[in-house]
Amino acid sequence: MMDRKNASPNSGTVIAIRGSVVDILFAEQLPPIRSLLTTGHQHQILIEVFSQLDEHRVRCIALTPTQGLARGMLVEDSGGPLLAPVGKTILSRMFDVFGNAIDRKAPPIGTQWRSVHNEPPAIAQLATKSQVFETGIKMIDVLMPLERGGKAGLFGGAGVGKTVLLTEMIHNMVGQHAGVSIFCGIGERCREGEELYREMKTAGVLDNMVMVFGQMNEPPGARFRVGHAALTMAEYFRDDEHRDVLLLIDNIFRFIQAGMEVSGLMGQMPARLGYQPTLGTELSQLEDRIANTDSGAITSIQAVYVPADDFTDPAAVHTFSHLSASIVLSRKRASEGLYPAIDPLLSNSKMATPSIIGRRHYDLAQKIRSTLAQYAELKDIIAMLGMEQLSPADHKIVARARRLERFFTQPFFTTEQFTSMPGKLVSLNDALDGCERILHDEFKDYPESALYMIGSIDEAVSKYRPKLDRVNSQ
């Protein structure tokens, strides 16, 4: 836990408790907003100042459960805001929002403590050069390339594969990524965090990774601050160590949801659909700190739960505006077994321009999108009249699109235990080569199943070419 030897002697008294909301009376000096206060018999209850009611009273939100708290109890001002541990010694460790180690090991030695509330980098410090960040996942690298130092969102409802895709990206990137990876779990299942820790440990990539959790069983105040704590750690590695950082957030919607709970507890007037009126400001305070500067880059990939698959929900709309790439997961594709269940027509990236990814990649991506869009339009005709009513040109479009859809499926390392299929990491050049050959009808005689759940296109060739040669020779 953070050092309180230099804590302020300022103290107050609890005068009202309403769930996680605590009103405190300070007879002398009023603590500033965002100050961390401690109370309870063993100073185990941590409270953050949310607003100042008058010259003697503050209204606070509890960051820990308030069991045992009573009116009249003494409250001490810690003398500053919530702090997070930073330094090389936090690598390979797992923390909660307060910087306590939760991996059943001794607390790290020699850590520094910094405020979780920091300002975004100045505009003059931001790097403007755009670079592509490869993931090893075919559909993402070809159609919606990610930006180094940018923010990508994984949008989807419940059970379409957001966490699996995020975990796969960690697996692929931590191995080839020279920097540091920080996983921030906001309001998600404790079980997933424990599984992720074991997987990363087994894969041997934990040495360059930090995990921070504020899970769904914790009070809204803790879930609301854990994202800021993870960002403080990321900023240390970027600004002090000059290393690139991969920040993975699961789930940014739970951050917004925690803010909504805090807003409701504080009695603020709700905005549309019950969201807090300060939704845009709160999200910007977090997102704007994720940036690419001259000293290094923080690249962020964020899972975004979409309530009831409604992409007009204010939480989804506000998150969209901060992202350089949006990866939309489709329940329909998941039901068809096309994993990763990414919708190629709804997903997009600001990086997909000729000046950044090159003319060949751009033209190929546009041709793939056009083919898949034409196939989507033809599906209604096929459903009503059958394939026989299509023209020869439309037949070719359907054949190419269906083979592209299957080629874009990919077995994941993180699902090997469920599917019994070894995971595949595919380079961008191999993915582009495969798409180009499919669009040139090189695989029109191959069954669609030959392209399903493979890595590079050469796997289909080596597996089915002997069979085709035997058929042709007969």
Swiss-Prot record:
Write down the CDD domains for this protein, in alphabetical order: ATP-synt_F1_beta_C, ATP-synt_F1_beta_N, F1-ATPase_beta_CD
Q: Which is a Gene Ontology cellular component entry for this protein?
A: proton-transporting ATP synthase complex
Question: What does the record give as the reaction this protein catalyses?
Answer: ATP + H2O + 4 H(+)(in) = ADP + phosphate + 5 H(+)(out)
Q: What is its main location?
A: membrane
Single GO molecular function:
proton-transporting ATP synthase activity, rotational mechanism
Tell me the NCBIfam families matching this sequence: alt_F1F0_F1_bet, atpD
Protein name as it appears in the record: ATP synthase subunit beta 2
Native organism is Shewanella frigidimarina (strain NCIMB 400)
